Amino acid sequence: MQLSPQASKTSSQSYQADDRNEQVLVYVNGEFVPRSEARISIFDAGYVSGDGVWEGLRLTNGRVTSFDAHVDRLFEGARTITLNIGLSKQEVKDVVRKTFERNGMVDGAHARLMITRGIKKTPNQDPRFIVGGPTIVCVAEHKVVTAEAKQRGLKLFTSTIRCSAPDVFDLRLNSHSRLNFIQALIQAINAGADEALMLDPHGFVSSCNSTNFFIVRGGAVWTSSGKYCFNGITRSTVLRLAREAGITTREGDFTLAEMYSAEEAFVTGTLGGITPVTQVDGRPIAIGPVTAKLDGLYRAYAEQA
């Protein structure tokens, strides 16, 4: 990948290095194997064509944040693409729990649960060439977000790559195929930003490449309609917490012009929770009281959820 020599090293996904991650055990189709020995077939549908669904899960104080919601979203996505996971929801939750437990993790950890359609007879996109059942992998790592992104905030760049309409590719589906988001992120990095802000097919603000995007105007919290972005669980939780705290929320279309004149901005995601945004397309935005309040509310929720 060709990146600018001045490319940013900061993102909402940035985390503190932890040597313990070199020794983690990875769940692969019912077995736990050392990270260095974890393997899947080169004929796996996820590798061949990005055919699969996934979830990111955060462990805080021995609890997986919004566990039921994540598992529900996983199964909804699998049904959408006619993928039989072959396990019940409880069995999937047990896989995640056991992966954390086998690695001695109780706090400050994050797991990526990945399920693909399985191995193919030949490398093509046709699901009729699948041999056997799905491939299920769970990677748990010690992950604590770096303080830098929270303290200085993120710099965003508005990408020319748009979020697609549902009749093209429904981005509310948490699929393995993320190429459009990756392209947008590369464009943003080469423009000197940390992450990409993306518009919907009609030119309204949609989301960032890996997080949901919010602004604050007149003390109210605004976010997109949700029609053209991933169905963020942290997003929905933050909206609920804001309403419970008496903060006005608005889900709907808004323009770049309205975003540029916002008082505050922030992004949400499973790993980073709430991360402030301090610059979009070179225009400064302050880290303000609404973002700080919501960050506190969400951290308290994650510690108890």
Question: Where on the chain are the PLM-derived regions?
Answer:
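Glycine- and Gly-Pro-enriched alpha-helical subdomains that act as flexible
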Residues: 197, 204-226, 231
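Conserved alpha/beta cores of soluble small-molecule-handling proteins
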Residues: 1-197, 201, 230, 235, ...
